[in-house]
C-alpha cells in the first residue's frame, strides 16, 4: 500500500471514529419548524443528491410541517425520486438576507394520502400538476437532520430535528 492510500485510509478511519455511523437524532418539531420557516422565507432552496458518483443539485420550493416533521414533495417520475430511493442522504442549502441554512439528513418517503394531501393543500400551485391520489405524487420527510444557520458576521447556530 502506498503512502497516499495509507493516509486516505487513516483519515477515513479517524472520521469514522469521530463521527461514527449516522446517529439517530430524536425528532424535534420546534427545530423542524425553525428550519421550515427559513426555507419558506428564502423561497427557493437547493436540494443535493447523488447519482452514482455524480452530485446533482436542483431548486425546490416545497417545505411544510406535517406531524411535527419537515416534509418536501416531488414526483415519482423525476430523477430526484430515483436518486433518493438509492441514497436518501441529502443536503439542502438556502440563502436570504445575508444568512444561509444548510440541512443534512435522510429523506424518508411517505406515500400516505394524508401526508400528500397536507402538502398539496398548503401549496395550491402544485394542484395543477399533482394529486394526492395519483401515481406520481410523493412526499419525503427529514430524519436525523442537522441544520446550521450561518453568515459571515455571526457565529453559526446548529440544531437537530
What are these regions, as identified by a protein language model?
Residues 1-4:
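Positively charged n-region of N-terminal signal peptides that target proteins for export
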Residues 7-16:
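Bacterial N-terminal signal peptides
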Amino acid at each position: 500500500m502506498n503512502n497516499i492510500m495509507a493516509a486516505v485510509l487513516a483519515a477515513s478511519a479517524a472520521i469514522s471514529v469521530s463521527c461514527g455511523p449516522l446517529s439517530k437524532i430524536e425528532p424535534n418539531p420546534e427545530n423542524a419548524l425553525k428550519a421550515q420557516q427559513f426555507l419558506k422565507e428564502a423561497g427557493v432552496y437547493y436540494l443535493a443528491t447523488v447519482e452514482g458518483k455524480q452530485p446533482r443539485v436542483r431548486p425546490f420550493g416545497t417545505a411544510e410541517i406535517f406531524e411535527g416533521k419537515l416534509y418536501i414533495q416531488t414526483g415519482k417520475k423525476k430523477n430526484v425520486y430515483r436518486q433518493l430511493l438509492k441514497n436518501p442522504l441529502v443536503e439542502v442549502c438556502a440563502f436570504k438576507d445575508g444568512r444561509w441554512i444548510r440541512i443534512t439528513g435522510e429523506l424518508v418517503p411517505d406515500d400516505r394520502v394524508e401526508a400528500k394531501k397536507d402538502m398539496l393543500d398548503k401549496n395550491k400551485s402544485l394542484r395543477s400538476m399533482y394529486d394526492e391520489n395519483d401515481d406520481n405524487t410523493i412526499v419525503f420527510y427529514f430524519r436525523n437532520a442537522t441544520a446550521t444557520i450561518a453568515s459571515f458576521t455571526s457565529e453559526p447556530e446548529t440544531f437537530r430535528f
